[in-house]
């Protein structure tokens, strides 16, 4: 079985001048993990932060929070060890960014991290299939990666459904434009890891939003198990 429904706030939409406090606010509001977007200005047209920030967050937040690193970088091989040393728990790289996913998966595992594999909206989901049994999580982007606050792409849901059908025990994450108005579609398609940025970060009651997202996801998962 997949690991259950989990909600990971994307800190891309947080007050970056108070990043540690923002992460604590999310964890105190019931977040299951933190989704950390690393962008290099090459793979995507934006720059965020790198492993020194991750190391600082780990020192401030302690060992318990799970850091899911979304590596939107053109050379994901370069940052495996630095991210592992900094305290990352999962290294999610883009299939489009490497010519040798197998070697990269092996390197990530040897550095003690879980493996996530992401695909952009324009990438055919079947290209991910050869690696599905070697990874811990598949990430289906529901916006073009690079910036927060974009409109959710509902036409990505068949990819999620295909992955859930073909690989029923795989963790499947969705990222981009996901919030209370769109999570139902994601959950019904089969996603069990929900990344949400603006909807949580900009809410007056982030705990309520996180609980709503988790409840919708859990109910859909329960219905799928009953329908089998």
From Swiss-Prot:
CDD domains: RPE
One Pfam family in the UniProt entry: Ribul_P_3_epim
Cofactor note as given: Binds 1 divalent metal cation per subunit. Active with Fe(2+), and probably also with Mn(2+), Zn(2+) and Co(2+).
Cofactor: Fe(2+); Mn(2+); Zn(2+); Co(2+)
Binding site for substrate: 10, 70, 146-149, 175-177, 197-198
Entry keywords, A to Z: Acetylation, Carbohydrate metabolism, Cobalt, Iron, Isomerase, Manganese, Metal-binding, Zinc
Biological process according to GO: carbohydrate metabolic process; pentose-phosphate shunt; pentose-phosphate shunt, non-oxidative branch
Keyword Isomerase among UniProt keywords: yes
PANTHER family: RIBULOSE-5-PHOSPHATE-3-EPIMERASE
Subunit and interaction comment: Homodimer.
Similarity comment: Belongs to the ribulose-phosphate 3-epimerase family.
Record protein name field: Ribulose-phosphate 3-epimerase
Annotated organism of origin: Mus musculus
Taxonomic lineage from the root: Eukaryota, Metazoa, Chordata, Craniata, Vertebrata
Gene: Rpe
């Amino acid at each position: 079985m997949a690991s259950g429904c989990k909600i990971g706030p994307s800190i891309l939409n947080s007050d970056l001048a108070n990043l540690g406090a923002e992460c604590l606010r999310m964890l105190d509001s019931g977040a299951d993990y933190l989704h950390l977007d690393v962008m290099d200005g090459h793979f995507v047209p934006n720059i965020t932060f790198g492993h020194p920030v991750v190391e600082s967050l780990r020192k401030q937040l302690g060992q318990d929070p799970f850091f899911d690193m979304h590596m939107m970088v053109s050379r994901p091989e370069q940052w495996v060890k630095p991210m592992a040393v900094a305290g990352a728990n999962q290294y999610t790289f883009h299939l489009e960014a490497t010519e040798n996913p197998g070697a990269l998966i092996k390197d990530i595992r040897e550095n003690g991290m879980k493996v996530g594999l992401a695909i952009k909206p324009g990438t055919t989901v079947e290209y991910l299939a050869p690696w599905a049994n070697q990874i811990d999580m598949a990430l289906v982007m529901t916006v073009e990666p690079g910036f927060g606050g974009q409109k959710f792409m509902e036409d990505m849901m068949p990819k999620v459904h295909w992955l859930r059908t073909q690989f029923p025990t795989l963790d499947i994450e969705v990222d981009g434009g996901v919030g209370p108005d769109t999570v139902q579609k994601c959950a019904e398609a089969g996603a069990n890891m929900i990344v949400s940025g603006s909807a949580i970060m900009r809410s007056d009651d982030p705990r309520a939003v996180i609980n709503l997202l988790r409840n919708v996801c859990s109910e859909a998962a329960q219905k799928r198990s009953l329908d089998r």
